[in-house]
Curated annotation (Swiss-Prot):
This is Cysteine--tRNA ligase. The gene is cysS. It holds the Pfam family CysS_C. A motif ('KMSKS' region) lies at residues 266-270. Its EC number is 6.1.1.16. It is found in: Cytoplasm. It comes from Finegoldia magna (strain ATCC 29328 / DSM 20472 / WAL 2508) (Peptostreptococcus magnus).
Amino acid sequence: MKLYNTLTRKKEEFKPIKEKNVGIYVCGPTVYNYIHVGNARPIVVFDTLRRYFIYKGYNVKFVSNFTDIDDKIINKAKDENIDFREITKKYIQAYLDNVSGLNFDEDDTIHPKATEYIDEMIKFVKTLEDKGAAYNVDGNVYFDITKAKDYGKLSKKNIDDLRAGARIDVNSEKKNPMDFALWKKRKEESEPAWESPWGMGRPGWHLECSVMSKTILGDTIDIHAGGEDLQFPHHENEIAQSETCTGAHFANYWLHNSMITVDKEKMSKSKNNFFLLKDIEKEFDLEVIRLWLLSVHYRNPIDFSHDTLVATKNSLDRLYTAKKFLNRILENSSEKEEKDDNIKTFREKFEQAMDDDINTADAISVLFDFIKYINKNYDENTSKNILLDAKKLMDDISYVLGILFKEDDDDLDSEIEELIEQRNAARKEKDFKKADEIRDKLLSMGIVLKDTRDGVIWERSN
């Protein structure tokens, strides 16, 4: 299995620290607002990575944090005149509701909150201070980037260029403009703060992830992941402070997903071109979002549009139709001792795609090729052994991709029947254009209509 390591800028064979065990840390949300579809990409991508490791027999320790203390949270609490913990509680629950719809494996996820690790953060900063890598200025503690070995090695940024390109820093407390806050002193009495050797204050954002990953996964972790926008300065600063503190290599593999675009521009709150999952969910099941996010390789940008989601929904319907067809013919299949070696070939192609840096786009193509093969070659006369092998492969691929997890798909049949009724009504009204459009929509879902003397019947296409 090869993964593209941002640190080395090449695909590398994955070698875990401990055989058949893997620790993964994914930077989670700052919980001050609802998550948008751009926030969903790392959730889906790295959950799929976790699922594939499990498929391959690994024990996985998966950590995704909540940043529950931050300037944005403090400002929102101030604006709404409520305690900051009410803000974080509300948006953590909203996040959990959304990721449940995305079929994120919540049960096997560790969700540390920054405020639960304050003591560990203070010890971490004290260690850096004792090593001469951090300095205190009137209650604010900064990391001195000149003390970090190879600063810029992840983002490939040169420290001298960074200094030259840095804006004139209004904070004259810093020794270098690129130094960053490890501990921030409280600005006013109403701000949340904790006691420390440097006075009342709170941790800096970069510090939080370093300490939580160290405490839960150890000084060196297998995989650190997140969106590519976190490469610099967040992940770069994590490396600097962690490796200076522990003297150990921080993470062996760095994985970064690319951005979501809208009309080829990055989706972001600052550009006001973002779409909240809770709003998208009013029209589309979040399983559609999951399949769409996996339809493009995670290191490539993916463009968001309503038309794309409609097409993805139709694709998902086709998959559910194939799943139901396979289950139905399995119930009536014959007990013959037969095998189909093509199933093994499809499995090998799926694994080949996933072993190549989690190429979910190719893996999905394999799945669609497989259901075409099922529709064309299998029926009630097919051996039960063959159909069980086919079902096992479909279930395994579905598990890894995190799709087709709904057992009751009566809703799909109801939708098909409703569309057929709409088509019948359109034909009675001689609105043949609308009737053809409905027929084409059903065809895109893998449903073929046949007009008979007894009425319209439908079946799955090949």
